Amino acid sequence: MKNITVKEMIKSAKENLTELSPQQVEANLTMQDVNIIDLRDTSELIENGIIPGSYHASRGHLEFFADPNCEYYKDFFNKEKNIILYCHSGARSALAAKTLQSMGYDKISHIKGGFKSWMKEVGIIVDYK
């Protein structure tokens, strides 16, 4: 088996992933059929805030929170909803999207450039509680 780099993994993940601009995500903030999920670690949320209305599922818990058959399942991972993922720069969210696709989620997208891009282009945040 060929070894691949994380850069190659991210590139591969993005090939089958819808990338949304921060402005496109901002337009979806109040939509009932959309769940925005922040994959950053808790310390990042405390330090930098979150996009309003987003849910938190750190990347390390993703598979457990997204599996309806797992005791740790979170109902904001709803296959009927459009799920928009984000992390700091878009790398973790691309990898997470690929994982969710393999788990049967087909309404997955992520913020191109992640939270960093969101802050530069939109800048609306709330404190994490």
Give the ranges of each region predicted by the language model.
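Rhodanese-like catalytic fold shared by cysteine-dependent sulfurtransferases
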Residues: 1-34, 42-82, 91-129
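Active-site flanking residues adjacent to catalytic metal/cofactor-binding acidic residues
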Residues: 37
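Short, surface-exposed ligand- or partner-binding patches at beta-edge/loop junctions that are enriched
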Residues: 86
